[in-house]
Amino acid sequence: MNTKELIASELSSIIDSLDQEAILKLLETPKNSEMGDIAFPAFSLAKVERKAPQMIAAELAEKMNSQAFEKVVATGPYVNFFLDKSAISAQVLQAVTTEKEHYADQNIGKQENVVIDMSSPNIAKPFSIGHLRSTVIGDSLSHIFQKIGYQTVKVNHLGDWGKQFGMLIVAYKKWGDEEAVKAHPIDELLKLYVRINAEAENDPSLDEEAREWFRKLENGDEEALALWQWFRDESLVEFNRLYNELKVEFDSYNGEAFYNDKMDAVVDILSEKGLLLESEGAQVVNLEKYGIEHPALIKKSDGATLYITRDLAAALYRKNEYQFAKSIYVVGQEQSAHFKQLKAVLQEMGYDWSDDITHVPFGLVTKEGKKLSTRKGNVILLEPTVAEAVSRAKVQIEAKNPELENKDQVAHAVGVGAIKFYDLKTDRTNGYDFDLEAMVSFEGETGPYVQYAYARIQSILRKADFKPETAGNYSLNDTESWEIIKLIQDFPRIINRAADNFEPSIIAKFAISLAQSFNKYYAHTRILDESPERDSRLALSYATAVVLKEALRLLGVEAPEKM
């Protein structure tokens, strides 16, 4: 139980008109610490109690009695709580030194499954910075949900089907070079894809030719299937190399093609339930009662099924296969209307588990304010970007610590971590402008800044040869250490907020605050000096390191022991 929960619990025992949850929402942190650590505004009780808020505050303060509080005073309409810093710091340090990396573990999920649809790049196209967002947000959410007691299933729903394969086959047959593709598959396939899109703008017959080849592919034409399989296999080799760089793993690579033989069953169910309507030769599901103006287009007039039909088949397959408690789609916010339709159609089909489906949208990555586009060849490719980030990190590490033994390994952890952290510290629904120099900086609100704070603490602990005692009598009451204690105590609540909002940035911002607070503490306090507080200061340093490393792990970022 954290401090706010304790106060809410104490107050709920003497306030009849508000429950603990309602009180918790009303608690505030005073701007001036001289006014206490936490405040409860009595305004909300004035109408029910028919008394002035000042009088209510005075009565509540008088009734409060807990050893966790140094004092409780009424100041005007507020009840101000001054916490017992020594008692709370002892409790927090005891918890972290005992539980270590399992501090803040919870069992909210009771081992139920959370399916996370994430990354999902298109076959035969390069893995760009645009795909990075879905990959790192999904990976972080997987760690967060595991931390609170869920099992996760990470699904890479590959874009391995569609008219673009018709375009690619036409381009390859016209201009492709087998040896060049074998040597650099994605580079060569991207050149072909960009070229055919440019030429198709002036030559509409290329579009028709591509449609014809895609029809052949759908009908199982041997040549078309062989080329498609080749493009897919070569792309996956490259993707997996990048996923290894990012240290991201998947439980399933079932992409769009996997559901080719599962869509007719969806159409049959919709038909049996009388949900399909005829509209200009196409078959649709009307969703007006859900406030959705456009009907869901299930089958075109030429009999071709659509993207939503495939996603319906995927949703049914995943529910049947994994019996999920939550199914999360980490997909750009431009797809919001699609996912509203998906949920509404499942609801129409009578599946109440449609409520367990959540679209987790995210904003765009731009470069110098401009939108990125594979088709126009305006794209930031991840592989050279990672290499550049690692190189920049290494330059800074060599300047800071020329004697460091495993520079390459540390530079990789810092460079990759910098890119991930910068993405994840951004509120998910906001976009950001890609700036590698800012990402890899050791100053400011960056991954390397947090990693360096962790490495600095490890250096302090090595110098002191500090090993925490699980029964250690650690306690502090100074202002600088109190700021750190409050943050560490809040870590379980931070994780819950991140899970509830599908928002890793909450954890990234927490990690920045904790690193900043420790650096401030380090500047003010001689941690290694002989004093009665030395062991407690070292225990605080140790606890900070444990929580920083765990916060970074939840973001999929490594924490090097030395930098």
UniProtKB/Swiss-Prot annotation:
Name it. Arginine--tRNA ligase
Q: Motif span ('HIGH' region)?
A: 121-131
Extract the PANTHER family matched here: ARGININE--TRNA LIGASE, CYTOPLASMIC, ARGINYL-TRNA SYNTHETASE
One GO term of the cellular component aspect? cytoplasm
Enzyme Commission no = 6.1.1.19
- UniProt subunit comment: Monomer.
Q: What is its main location?
A: cytoplasm
User: What residue intervals traverse the membrane?
Assistant: none
